[in-house]
Amino acid sequence: MSTAAIPTDAAVQAAIAEARARLADGSMRIRMAYEGHPATSTVLKGRAHLVDETIHRLWRACAMPADVALLAVGGYGRGELFPCSDVDLMVLLPDTADDAMQARLSVLLGALWDVGLEIGHSARTVAEAIDAAEQDITVQTNLLESRLLEGNRPLFEEFCRRYRALLDVRVFFKAKQLEQEKRYARYNDTPYALEPNCKESPGGLRDLQMLGWIARAAGLGRNWRDLARRRLITGAEARDLRSIERFLQHVRIRLHYLTGRSEDRLLFDYQERLASALGIEATAAKRASEVFMQRYYVNAKKVTQTNTILLQNYGVEIFPRRAGAAIVINERFQAVRELLDMREDDTFARHPSALLECFLILQQRSELKGMTARTLRALWLNRKRINAAFRADPHNRELFVAILQQKRGIVHEFRRMNQYGILSGYLPSWRRIVGQMQHDLFHVYTVDQHIMMVLRNMRRFTMGEHAHEYPLMAQLIMAFDRHWLLYVAALFHDIAKGRGGDHSKLGTIDAREFCEHHHLAREDADLVVWLVEHHLTMSHVAQKEDTSDPAVIGRFADTVGTERRLTALYLLTHADIRGTSPKVWNGWKGKLLEDLFFATRRLLRGATPQEALGLDDRQENARALLRYHGLRPGVEDALWAQLDAVYFMRHSAEEIAWHSRTLYYRPDALEPVVKARVSDADQGVQVMVFTRDQKDLFVRLTGFFGRLGFSILDAKVHTTRHGYALDSFMLQDPGNAEHYRDVITLIEHELTERLKKSAPPDRPSAGRLSRQVKHFPITPRVSILPDESGRHYILSLTAADRRGLLFAVAEVLAQNGIVLHTAKIATLGERVEDTFLLSGNGLSQDARVVKIERELLQRLHI
């Protein structure tokens, strides 16, 4: 390596100071120019040029050897830099770096960091660079657009020759396809998340970049116009892509400026300000952020459409093979290279019904892997042929029902129909929910994508490969005659979202109209409409009402009416909750629904309310479990004599046996007994507390759990006949299951000691509100109403979830002398909807109730 005089530290520091000032001044000028006249090139090209100049100065100031080459790689190599993007560099060495060279590189890289650049770098010989590219597709991609910044041009040209020799376009194409599939999977295969990543999510900038990389690697072109000239896309598609690319670039530029960092997620916190920065205004019906996000979704959808078409066309270019004879399917379609192809360019114009028929053919012919690019393009361009006359055509109605009735491909084809605008054409109500955001803080998808997730879940219940995940669901749906009706209910259950009013009621109008137009039998139509109207009922009863109360089960059974309706509603409810967000479903909710399902089914099959709840069976099964654990008959009698029927109704046989094993020999325990275990739902920890009843006990228990950071999923408060509290809690640990043994030990020891000492209640910290709640605040609601028996009162509250919330409620109730019997905690993402069964003097007095409600609201407001 050549040796040049190493500059003095003072000279380097002076160069750094000057470069830092120039970079800051240049960055400010670029931003001002962009704000004055927003053009993406002002930032992307301008910042890349500014960084080029900075690097040139520092390279010279550090007197780097002439035989070394400095390359810009990645996006910077392409000559584009977003405001806060990393600057990716590769130092190309003629030989392995010695100590002197390492020292010079350290000075240069240190200088680049000191001026304020975020540097990503590597230092390699040509052989090392080629080897790294062979081993890692990410490195290979990064080097695809490399350009020489400084230094040894012959060395750079040697690297370019060897890189081109290495590049196998076929391998590169397949690797990038696989990479995209994995990336899509990380984002649940949808661009319609409520907080998408504008760079990495499906339909984001990365999709466009990937199309560019493959085109460049295959020599197909360097921009969208080149691809249009090669007829890989149309001129209109090229213009659309450039327009969409600019939109996404504007979004990312604004996001970087707004956050001051390389942030690519469109978080709720930023959406309103981004809309303002982009000049997007609110409408009478939608806030500016919603208008902005719908525009984002429309553009992301177009990107994914064109991505599919272009990748297919790339494949034809990269893997040329003799076109085999097309296999004729019917007058309208043929199979070409395992893809469905229209036989004539005007197929959809001459045969509009083919707009639905093509999806049915894909379902019926498993050898077909998709549609040809020209068919997909024509599908999109002809989507508006689906009009009132099309929808009224009996043949088209038969085709749509046939698609729903197929044994395979239902989810794939409905997603494709949604992607290409066919579903919006055929179901006019669907248009209103495409890209519609949901600000309820537990749905993480737009309305149309949530429905697709529910449809997917329902479909999975029927598939053998998923039976181990949902064994009961699989058993029920396979015994359910005409289960395609459940798919219809799934399609319509949320179709009236966002119209104002009760979407469950409004949706029945659309569902009834669909059923009548498609000639569903009266019984089937009634089932679909009933499911749409009641799709929230089972979730409400299971999570908010006392399902150990025979009256609650009786009312729910009256609402359901038949076992067929019950089964259908159970399947839809399960699929619906799982389709809201990966975080909303848990095993505890599954158990609540399952218990309600079986109790109601027994009642519908003729059991008495007591038999339906399994009270006698529960005691018998609990005794059997005690015998199984080696306890002799009758040891439980002393304890059970102190427990009333309410206790046995509210606990499962397994819980009763667990309590009994722990307490049978000490029903008059002098000291508190605390036992904990991992729940059988594998979702947290069950805790049992047995101690002499005392004032503020529930407040102390909730304070203790709140201080440890546990969420209380369920609480059952019981007082025995001899004055002991036997309280049960289901807790969700904010950590993970790996340390449950330590958690159980901590709870049993520390809580026992605190109860022994009659220590004052722990005051859990209020906890911080999530950013979602800050952006979409939840107005607390509280109501206290008598139950139907007139013996108890039901407190219902809705509020933003936070640590210590249940403690605050318990404290207000205790201060007012109110006795709490059960607590049902329904956590829906960032929102809680809790229900408490109460009793106490004064609850029959309106003034007293108003006072308690006011105090609760004061504690719930943050």
Swiss-Prot record:
Residues 329-685 are annotated as: Uridylyl-removing. Modifies, by uridylylation and deuridylylation, the PII regulatory proteins (GlnB and homologs), in response to the nitrogen status of the cell that GlnD senses through the glutamine level. Under low glutamine levels, catalyzes the conversion of the PII proteins and UTP to PII-UMP and PPi, while under higher glutamine levels, GlnD hydrolyzes PII-UMP to PII and UMP (deuridylylation). Thus, controls uridylylation state and activity of the PII proteins, and plays an important role in the regulation of nitrogen assimilation and metabolism. InterPro entries: ACT-like_dom_sf, ACT_dom, HD/PDEase_dom, HD_domain, NT_sf, PII_UdlTrfase/GS_AdlTrfase, UTase/UR. Its EC number is 2.7.7.59, 3.1.4.-. Its cofactor is Mg(2+). Belongs to the GlnD family. It catalyses: [protein-PII]-L-tyrosine + UTP = [protein-PII]-uridylyl-L-tyrosine + diphosphate; [protein-PII]-uridylyl-L-tyrosine + H2O = [protein-PII]-L-tyrosine + UMP + H(+). Residues 447-563 form the HD domain. GO terms for biological process: regulation of nitrogen utilization. This is Bifunctional uridylyltransferase/uridylyl-removing enzyme. Residues 1-328 are annotated as: Uridylyltransferase. Residues 686-765, 794-862 form the ACT domain. Keywords: Hydrolase, Magnesium, Multifunctional enzyme, Nucleotidyltransferase, Repeat, Transferase. The keyword Hydrolase applies. Has four distinct domains: an N-terminal nucleotidyltransferase (NT) domain responsible for UTase activity, a central HD domain that encodes UR activity, and two C-terminal ACT domains that seem to have a role in glutamine sensing. Uridylyltransferase (UTase) activity is inhibited by glutamine, while glutamine activates uridylyl-removing (UR) activity. NCBIfam families: PRK03059.1, UTase_glnD. One of its GO terms (molecular function) is phosphoric diester hydrolase activity.
